[in-house]
Amino acid sequence: MGCAYSCCLEVCCGEDEIVYPRMPGESTVCHREREKPITYHWYHWHPGHIYPRVASMEDYDEDLVQEASSEDVLGVHMVDKDTERDIEMKRQLRRLRELHLYSTWKKYQEAMKTSLGVPQCERDEGSLGKPLCPPEILSETLPGSVKKRVCFPSEDHLEEFIAEHLPEASNQSLLTVAHADTGIQTNGDLEDLEEHGPGQTVSEEATEVHMMEGDPDTLAELLIRDVLQELSSYNGEEEDPEEVKTSLGVPQRGDLEDLEEHVPGQTVSEEATGVHMMQVDPATPAKSDLEDLEEHVPGQTVSEEATGVHMMQVDPATLAKQLEDSTITGSHQQMSASPSSAPAEEATEKTKVEEEVKTRKPKKKTRKPSKKSRWNVLKCWDIFNIF
């Protein structure tokens, strides 16, 4: 029977199939061995392992090895410094047009050319790429509101200002003049503001500030004139030391003589500073203070008067007498208590203690409960219930 069953299985199954004897409880369906999928790992097969063929340097021509020029390569332009500068200036001009400052910049440029004596050929070519000139440097220090409106006129004093005085100008003076020319008035009286600026708005009246709207040329002339006046007043001269002393408040010689008359014992430094330090001996106070001290404490010494402290002086004989009196009174108090009465008092005290011990009831001996007893456990639970 077993041979017939095995033959039947061989006929049903193909040659490639592996036949196993059927186990009890196993289905009669033929089980084939599962084939594992073939996986190609990266170290077995990878596109990166297909290396391209590396050609030798002999294949390259010398013309190909040379640097690519702007004519050979599309989209690449070799720009020199002049072209780059012109591009940058054009970009700046475009930005000025966007900010509505192109006309102002044009006025600065024309004023700079006429004031510095630039030749006609350079004026035609333009001053693109040149460093900022003194008028433009001055314009950079001005506030934005003035920078939009001020233009530099072409006059003779402008050339002198640029050539001589502008490098010596201080930032503080420029800012002071600029703030003065903006026309900001902070007068607290509205009537005065209305007199100076009748076209004042409601907001300007409320804030007590009026913005002067003037001609840009007039503002520029006022600005340059004030700066020139301030710089011409300096002229690089040193200040007189006497004037410096006077400005600092140092007294003059005549004032020093007056000080010597008032305070004859004054030193030179005290005369210069105008301060006199009174030298007083600590052991010799003022006469009025001594009189007051003598009135209150007649037996006071000179040092006690100076320090304001008086030490009481007592006769030693009086002190000895007081000491003897105190010792005598103490001995009398001790002798008043008789020596024979002491043992009797001790005996009575002992008898009282013995009687109290006899009459005292014996205490009951109570056993201390252990920590694990029921009573202690209940107490613990009561504590927990309280909380």
From Swiss-Prot:
**Compositional bias of type Basic residues: which residue ranges?**
360-374
Q: Where is this region: Disordered?
A: 233-256, 327-374
Bias (Basic and acidic residues) ranges: 347-359
- Residue spans of biased composition, Low complexity class: 336-345
InterPro entries, sorted = FAM153
**What family does this belong to?**
Belongs to the FAM153 family.
PANTHER family associated with the record: FAMILY WITH SEQUENCE SIMILARITY 153 MEMBER C-RELATED (PTHR40712), PROTEIN FAM153A-RELATED (PTHR40712:SF2)
Know the name of this protein? Answer: Protein FAM153B
The source organism is: Homo sapiens
For this protein's source organism, the top of the classification is: Eukaryota, Metazoa, Chordata, Craniata, Vertebrata
